[in-house]
Regions:
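Short helix-capping/linker turns of helical repeat alpha-solenoids
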Residues: 14-16, 46-48, 78-80, 110-113, ...
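Conserved alpha-helical positions within TPR/SEL1-like repeat arrays
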Residues: 18-25, 50-57, 82-89, 132
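TPR/TPR-like (Sel1-like) alpha-helical repeat modules
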Residues: 76-79, 97-115, 135
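Terminal, low-structured helical/coil segments at or just beyond the last alpha-helical repeat
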Residues: 111-148
């Protein structure tokens, strides 16, 4: 593990974005949240959408919703299905059902449009959960009564 960490750091120093992401993941798995945030942020700055989503997850767990939604939205803008789902969750939690449904629909669109993504994101579970959220919202909320 120390050897892996050293190799990844050398690659990251050469601006290798996947190495930065992996360092963030490695630090997260070891419970080193500040290191994890640092490496995820570096990868996110270079456009790595899963790093953006994971960084947002950390901010969310810390109670920093402002930073969390900022990074979820950045990743969602690049069609990251996990981030799209998380933005949908954010809006659902804030009772903005119309916008939540739009984001959940985008998840399904991305998964349909890019079937290879299913492998990368274990997206069959994501697809099922997204459909469940949409069905729940359709069944339990009157869209006309919602604010945008």
């Amino acid at each position: 593990t120390r050897e892996v960490d050293t190799r990844l750091k050398k690659a990251a120093e050469k601006d290798h974005v996947v190495a930065m992401y992996e360092l963030g993941l490695f630090a997260f798995e070891q419970g080193r949240m500040e290191d994890s945030k640092k490496w995820y942020a570096k990868a996110a700055e270079r456009g790595h959408t899963t790093a953006m989503n994971n960084l947002a997850n950390i901010y969310s767990k810390e109670g920093n919703e402002k930073e969390a939604i900022k990074f979820y939205l950045k990743a969602a803008e690049k069609s990251n299905p996990l981030a799209l789902f998380n933005v949908g969750n954010y809006y659902e939690g804030n009772k903005n059902i119309k916008v939540a449904k739009q984001y959940y629909s985008k998840v399904l669109h991305v998964l349909k449009e890019y079937p290879d993504i299913l492998k990368e994101y274990s997206a069959s579970d994501l697809e099922t959960e997204t459909m469940n959220r949409l069905l729940y919202l359709e069944k339990n909320f009157d869209e006309d009564a919602e604010t945008e």
